[in-house]
Amino acid sequence: MAFLNMETGELTFTDGFRLSAGLAMGELADALGGAMDGVVRLGGHTAGGGVLIPVCAVQGSALQSVTLSISSVGNRPMRKAERQREFLFARLNVQDPFPDTLIPVHITCPFGEMHISTDPYTGRTEARIIYTAQ
C-alpha cells in the first residue's frame, strides 16, 4: 500500500494512522480540544522505515493541509539534507527533479498540491500537502 494516494491525498502511515482531506476526528479533534480551527502537531507516525511528524492545519473543522517533517529513519536521526530529501520523495512516491541542487519542488495533484523544500543551512526537508476545497 502506498503512503500517499495521489488521487485523494490520503496519507496512510505504517502504524495504521490516516489523514485525509476534510478529516477532523479522532486524534485531530482531541488535539484541538473541540475548536473548529487551529494547527495541531501530532506525534510521530511510522512510514516506510522512518518516522514522520505531521503538523495539521484545520479550518472550519476540516483538514486543510499537512506538513510532514522527518524525525528519523531506521532509528537514526536524519541529519544530511540529501538523505532526508531522498527519504521524503520516496515516501511520497514522487521523482525528485532536482536531487543535486535541493531546489524546492511544487507538484499539482488531483487533490490539491504539494510543496517539498529543503533548508540549505539545516538540511531539514519538509513536504506540505494542501487540499483543495471540494
What are these language model-derived features?
Residues 1-103, 114, 118-134:
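Short helix/turn-capping signatures at newly exposed starts of structured segments
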